[in-house]
Amino acid sequence: MPSGFFRAANNAAIAADARADVARRLANATTGWNVVAVGTNGRPGLGLRAAKEEEGIDRALTDCNRQDLRCHVIAIGPFSVEPLPVSTQP
């Protein structure tokens, strides 16, 4: 599995219209486990501030499955989130 920095603002797996919101929500989730899942159409699901890794995964997949199909986890962990580039800030 690849490792490194996860950048929601430019991650091609996430639908373009959802990237800034995912990045903002991750930046605000400063404690616990944070998980991002996406489905076949790139609709994201988030599991934020979970006490346990498994809890975050379950939340993200449940959230994703409400709006997309065949959801899978694309990022997991306590994130260090960098600010959005000036051109993509709301």
Question: Each predicted region: which residue ranges?
Answer:
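Secreted/extracellular ectodomain signature
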Residues: 1-90
